[in-house]
Curated annotation (Swiss-Prot):
One of its GO terms (cellular component) is cytosol. This is Ribosome-binding factor A. InterPro entries: KH_dom-like_a/b, RbfA, RbfA_dom_sf. HAMAP family: RbfA. One of several proteins that assist in the late maturation steps of the functional core of the 30S ribosomal subunit. Associates with free 30S ribosomal subunits (but not with 30S subunits that are part of 70S ribosomes or polysomes). Required for efficient processing of 16S rRNA. May interact with the 5'-terminal helix region of 16S rRNA. The lineage of its organism: Bacteria, Pseudomonadati, Pseudomonadota, Betaproteobacteria, Burkholderiales. One of its GO terms (biological process) is maturation of SSU-rRNA. It comes from Variovorax paradoxus (strain S110). The gene is rbfA. It comes from the Bacteria. It is found in: Cytoplasm.
């Protein structure tokens, strides 16, 4: 049996990018859960078989645990919305994870500022 040709390597990136755009719109316009406030989708990682997608998000205010729980409970609703928009055979199961990158960057900036301030005091 001949080998099946592998999909283009950047197709997964294109699908992830489209999922990110569509999810941003779905959350902002159609999700009515009060536990979900100002959520920003930072990144989407799709498995090679498109069965699962990790959705990394950040938020300005609110409880991280509560928002993560609300988004994971709404995953079926959001997946159904993606099914109507995407034209792929399998719409992935969505797994929402809080992205702590911005928090870590702020902590690093504070540490750098502290080091610079202590260095200038030493001079």
């Amino acid at each position: 049996m001949p080998k099946r040709k592998a999909a283009a390597p950047n197709r997964a990136f294109k699908v992830a990018d489209q999922i990110q755009r569509d999810l941003t719109e779905l959350i902002a316009r159609e999700l009515k859960d009060p536990r979900v406030g100002m959520v920003t989708i930072q990144a989407v990682e799709v498995t090679p078989d498109y069965a699962h997608a990790k959705i990394y998000f950040s938020m300005l205010t609110g409880d991280v645990t509560e928002t993560t729980e609300a988004l994971n409970q709404a995953a079926g609703f959001l997946r159904n919305g993606l099914f109507k928009r995407l034209h792929i055979h399998t719409v992935p199961t969505l797994h929402f994870l809080f992205d702590r990158t911005t928090e870590r960057a702020a902590d690093m900036n504070a540490l750098i500022a502290q080091a610079v301030a202590s260095r200038s005091k030493d001079d």
